[in-house]
Amino acid sequence: MDDNKKRALAAALGQIERQFGKGAVMRMGDHERTGIPAISTGSLGLDIALGIGGLPKGRIVEIYGPESSGKTTLTLSVIAEAQKSGATCAFVDAEHALDPEYAGKLGVNVDDLLVSQPDTGEQALEITDMLVRSNAVDVIIVDSVAALVPKAEIEGEMGDMHVGLQARLMSQALRKITGNIKNANCLVIFINQIRMKIGVMFGSPETTTGGNALKFYASVRLDIRRTGAVKEGDEVVGSETRVKIVKNKVSPPFRQAEFQILYGKGIYRNGEIIDLGVSQGLVEKSGAWYAYQGNKIGQGKANAAKYLQENPAIGAEIEKQIREKLLKAGVVAEAGKAAAADAKADDVADADAGY
């Protein structure tokens, strides 16, 4: 750059700083670049598939899927993981369906959880914005976008037409809160439902509620599906779950993870540790026996997972090695598939070790 351009640029930068404050425009090379901080999802395979070890702070995340696919369970698991590090979490329960007892079983500290059950969509989004602007809340869950009913629709008659009201509400709210979320370094997760588009001949007829704004503003979008049942004999005790990362602005997208959700216990984390440990050569498997550093830890995956629950330090040690090996090496594609493959072969449901 020649001297005239340098002087002109310096003058422009000086004027911008005087008018808008220091830091309004910066050279990226003047500041040390750090990795994006993340909060674990509670699923080791999903954390690895996301590429940064969890969901990014300071961003908007959308989790959508059919009914009973595990959307709320996954978000409660995120809250439980965040609270372990002392984070303050809030749950905006627009569906008025949060079960504190179930949340407690998943590891959520219910006493410290902030809960709001707003009457209208405007109220829910205003509360969300105020919590973000407080700079004191680390994780906010909005459950769900479909339940953010505009005030005009609530006060109107049943059957009245309100075309595009919810989409306009979401678009306006997201324009307002996105910058605040980045400044507060707060993770905001919107749970969304699936609807069917009428008259679609080609491509998927599925779409999410609330218009297109959330699709654009979200840094990460997760499509969660129930793919099968976890059985103990004839009794169904859990769900086989697949999560596909359909959008990811912080790492390569379109990866997926598979894990199990056990009813009343949550994500079967110790099972994931065993399977990923075997796939990475950290846990030895000989026949039905599993061993770690030459010491047998159980016959069958269920018993090995139970051993990790009884010895959490060993489980944490194996998990740390898996994260370092996969995240630093960038070997993240299909990280959860190994966990799902062995899970179907073993009698996982016997384990009392839900985590």
Swiss-Prot record:
GO BP annotations of the record are: DNA recombination; DNA repair; SOS response
Compartment(s) of residence: Cytoplasm
Task: Give the molecular function GO annotations.
Answer: ATP binding; ATP hydrolysis activity; ATP-dependent DNA damage sensor activity; damaged DNA binding; single-stranded DNA binding
Ligand binding (ATP): G65, P66, E67, S68, S69, G70, K71, T72
An annotated GO cellular component: cytosol
UniProt keyword annotations, A-Z: ATP-binding, Cytoplasm, DNA damage, DNA recombination, DNA repair, DNA-binding, Nucleotide-binding, SOS response
Q: Name one Pfam family in it.
A: RecA
Summary of the function given for this chain in its UniProt record: Can catalyze the hydrolysis of ATP in the presence of single-stranded DNA, the ATP-dependent uptake of single-stranded DNA by duplex DNA, and the ATP-dependent hybridization of homologous single-stranded DNAs. It interacts with LexA causing its activation and leading to its autocatalytic cleavage.
- Which family is this protein grouped under? Belongs to the RecA family.
Q: What is this protein called?
A: Protein RecA
What is the scientific name of the source organism? Answer: Pseudomonas putida (strain W619)
Query: Which gene is the coding source of this polypeptide chain?
Result: recA
